[in-house]
Amino acid sequence: MAISEHASGTRTAGTPPEAGFTALGTGGDTTDGVFQFYIDVSNLANGATSDAIEIQVLEKVLSSGTARVVFEAYLIGAQDEPIWVSPALLLLHGWTLQIKQTAGTARTYDWSIRKVA
């Protein structure tokens, strides 16, 4: 099985709290595979209002269905591990990795989507 980087980039948060999520990569991606998501969260900081982010992965059960949350994580303040890694997820019908900053100071996050094919 080959391992590859499916997509990567840098996401700059708006002024927290952000009203909506921002997709990392292509929203509604229909590429089949086993994926892991990596986000550099080393910029998260503690403070009077600690930085906080919400991460979601959405997927459809059927290709004609509605994308719904299949995995969700909340990170608050400085993290012991500077890179957040999702579990491996089998995705295929229309999936999205998305993030929003809910509190603190607007931060920049590098991210990578890794695929096993």
Features from the language model and the residues they span:
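C-terminal interaction-tip segments
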Residues: 1-16, 33, 101-117
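Surface-exposed loop/edge segments in extracytoplasmic proteins
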Residues: 2-4, 63-72
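Solvent-exposed serine/threonine-rich low-complexity stretches and specific carbohydrate-binding patches
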Residues: 9, 68-78
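Tryptophan-centered short beta-strand motifs
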Residues: 11, 16, 21, 64-69
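Exposed aromatic-hydrophobic patches
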Residues: 22-26, 80-89
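Noncatalytic modules at the cell exterior or secretory-pathway interfaces
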Residues: 32-39, 88-109
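Short amphipathic, basic-aromatic surface patches that mediate peripheral association
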Residues: 38-47
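Short, surface-exposed beta-strand/strand-loop-strand elements in extracellular ectodomains
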Residues: 48-63
